[in-house]
């Protein structure tokens, strides 16, 4: 097979051009959005009957940002609900909306509808082409190669008005653009559509692994939407590898696969291969017996060049385990986007995930940035949590090192929409900013004057998990937290799922370590004054976070949409966690 290069220079050349002229391109993007959707009910409410085509770019931007308010999903929800109920008049877009996406509801505990149009699928195809082009500069792959992709299409349902609802990834995997992406990038997923859309995580994952090994010599890289999914898949593989070897040897399929369409599709692809089964068995015995599964991916897929997934933000906790499985294989952080819009591409795929930032693609949406400043005194106004907000600025006015909340105006009918993501401008690619994702704005632990971010929590758990691994043979599999404000005094609760055995003394030390590792001044003072109670560590039984994921997937979300929230107030999730708690510890720090 030949190395893929054709077409990469063209798409990179396009992006270099729009990046160089990002300011002008952003003005053109806003104009295109407003011209395409001129006259829709929502824009008429704020802009009246203004003739967009007769205005110059500067006047149009000024008018738009002065008259159209910044909104949250709650402000647009009545319009989206009318669309869902079957109203066909142009409310948000001139293009009829027949499909709605479920935006991730794992952070606030509820699902949100977002319009999905052909533009959504087209930008997904474009960013995948662009990402593949930049990756090929460092990790060229062979034409016609395979991808071991752990991808899952969730369930779809119909609204009262007959619109199809599902996750954005579910819509994409069913689209022509998904097929085009494989043909354009010359890389083909190992699994057929019947596996991707199977709807049962365990059965789908088993088949992904089986077919990945069936095509093992052809696999060029391993991928999934989130690093969590890859880690979960290979953790599952540790338990079922013998079963997979038996299937490869006999050309059969385990009885655990009960979905008829999936069974038929997989059985049509595999044939008995005793020599491959023996080879895999030999490697797995060595991995299991002597290596603790270190290097699993690189040993079983020797031609794989890298592993690709979202690895930033709430995916950072899974990097250590992913690196363990990778065994030196490069980890490439996938691009930055949301259900609402793709935002930025990773133009530096050779960098470790911890150092990655994303170059904003100025044609995908019109971007604004709300400057965020840490609160200095109590007299500040316009305070939201731990920040003072300044007036939003366009992409052309962002500053290096400044933190912002992203605001989107999209082709799909979201106007000056607060995304909730806090980002930092780390550098520039030509004329477009490169953004580092900091955290979701509302994911902050707080009882009173204390303010701890997702990054703070991650650092605290990292310190305690290192202590756990030094003193025991156990490791933290997953975690989340909750600010218990009902108890008096309120306190932080951190839930751990661990693998291996850890005695109570070690876990008590871990609990104490986490309590003292929060260095936010408001927290330390409050703990000393006992206005915040001792931190509580709750250890949950094995498989608990899997139950949480299944519950979310069961509510019509796809696993590709699911991310373990690092802080939760969701009552359903808390019920699962609390019902599964097997040990509790309270910190003795500050006694």
From Swiss-Prot:
<dbReference type="GO" id="GO:0016874">
    <property type="term" value="F:ligase activity"/>
</dbReference>
<comment type="function">
    <text>Catalyzes the synthesis of indole-3-acetic acid (IAA)-amino acid conjugates, providing a mechanism for the plant to cope with the presence of excess auxin. Involved in red light-specific hypocotyl elongation. May act downstream of a red light signal transduction and determine the degree of hypocotyl elongation.</text>
</comment>
<dbReference type="Pfam" id="PF03321">
    <property type="entry name" value="GH3"/>
</dbReference>
<dbReference type="InterPro" id="IPR004993">
    <property type="entry name" value="GH3"/>
</dbReference>
<dbReference type="Pfam" id="PF23572">
    <property type="entry name" value="GH3_C"/>
</dbReference>
<dbReference type="GO" id="GO:0009416">
    <property type="term" value="P:response to light stimulus"/>
</dbReference>
<dbReference type="InterPro" id="IPR055378">
    <property type="entry name" value="GH3_C"/>
</dbReference>
<protein>
    <recommendedName>
        <fullName>Indole-3-acetic acid-amido synthetase GH3.10</fullName>
        <ecNumber>6.3.2.-</ecNumber>
    </recommendedName>
</protein>
<comment type="similarity">
    <text>Belongs to the IAA-amido conjugating enzyme family.</text>
</comment>
<dbReference type="InterPro" id="IPR055377">
    <property type="entry name" value="GH3_M"/>
</dbReference>
<dbReference type="GO" id="GO:0009507">
    <property type="term" value="C:chloroplast"/>
</dbReference>
<dbReference type="Pfam" id="PF23571">
    <property type="entry name" value="GH3_M"/>
</dbReference>
<keyword id="KW-0436">Ligase</keyword>
């Amino acid at each position: 097979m030949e190395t893929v290069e054709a077409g990469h220079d063209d798409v990179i050349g396009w992006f270099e051009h729009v990046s160089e002229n990002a300011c002008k391109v952003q003005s053109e993007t806003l104009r295109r959005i407003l011209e395409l959707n001129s006259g829709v009910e929502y824009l008429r409410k704020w802009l009246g009957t203004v003739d967009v085509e007769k205005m110059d770019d500067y006047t149009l931007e000024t008018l738009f940002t002065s008259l159209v308010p910044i909104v949250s999903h709650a402000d647009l929800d009545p319009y989206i609900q009318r669309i869902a109920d079957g109203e066909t008049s142009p409310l948000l877009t001139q293009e009829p909306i027949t499909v709605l996406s479920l935006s991730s509801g794992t952070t606030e505990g509820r699902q949100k509808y977002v319009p999905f149009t052909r533009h959504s699928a087209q930008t997904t195809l474009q960013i995948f082409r662009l990402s593949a082009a930049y990756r090929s500069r460092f990790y060229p792959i062979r034409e016609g190669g395979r991808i071991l992709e752990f991808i899952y299409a969730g369930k779809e349902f119909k609204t009262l008005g007959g619109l199809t609802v599902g996750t954005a990834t579910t819509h994409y995997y069913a689209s022509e653009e998904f097929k085009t992406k494989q043909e354009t990038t010359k890389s083909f997923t190992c699994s057929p559509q019947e596996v991707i859309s199977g709807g049962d995580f365990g059965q789908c994952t088993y088949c992904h692994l089986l077919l990945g090994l069936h095509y093992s010599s052809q696999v060029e890289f391993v991928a999934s939407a989130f690093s969590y999914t890859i880690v979960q898949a290979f953790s599952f593989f540790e338990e079922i590898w013998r079963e997979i070897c038996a299937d490869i040897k006999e050309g059969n399929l385990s009885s655990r696969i009960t979905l008829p369409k999936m069974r038929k599709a997989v059985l049509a692809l595999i044939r008995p291969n005793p020599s491959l089964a023996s080879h895999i068995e030999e490697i797995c015995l060595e991995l299991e017996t002597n290596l603790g599964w270190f290097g699993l991916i690189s040993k079983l897929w020797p031609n794989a060049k890298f592993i690709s997934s979202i690895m930033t933000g709430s995916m950072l906790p899974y990097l250590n385990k992913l690196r363990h499985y990778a065994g030196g294989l490069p980890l490439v952080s996938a691009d930055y986007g949301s259900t609402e819009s793709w935002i930025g591409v990773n133009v530096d795929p050779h960098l470790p995930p911890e150092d990655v930032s994303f170059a904003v693609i100025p044609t995908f949406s019109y971007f604004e940035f709300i400057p965020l400043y840490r609160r200095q005194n109590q007299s500040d106004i316009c305070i939201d949590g731990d920040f003072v907000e300044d007036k939003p600025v366009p992409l052309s006015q962002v500053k290096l090192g400044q933190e912002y909340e992203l605001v989107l105006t999209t082709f799909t009918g979201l106007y000056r929409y607060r995304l909730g993501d806090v980002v930092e401008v780390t550098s520039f690619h030509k004329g477009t900013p490169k953004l580092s994702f900091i955290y979701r704005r509302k994911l902050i632990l707080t009882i009173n004057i204390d303010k701890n971010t997702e990054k703070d929590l991650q650092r605290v758990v990292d310190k305690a998990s290192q202590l756990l691994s030094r003193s025991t043979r156990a490791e933290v599999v997953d975690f989340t937290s909750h600010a218990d404000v009902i108890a008096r005094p309120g306190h932080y609760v951190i839930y751990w799922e661990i693998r291996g055995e850890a005695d109570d003394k070690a876990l008590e030390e871990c609990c104490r370590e986490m309590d003292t590792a929060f260095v936010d001044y408001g927290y330390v003072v409050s703990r000393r004054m006992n206005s915040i109670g001792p931190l509580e560590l709750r250890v949950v039984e094995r498989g608990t976070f899997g139950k949480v994921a299944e519950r979310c997937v069961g509510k019509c979300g796809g696993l590709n949409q699911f991310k373990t929230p690092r802080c939760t107030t969701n009552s359903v999730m808390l019920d699962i966690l609390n019902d599964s708690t097997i040990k509790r510890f309270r910190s003795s720090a500050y006694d």
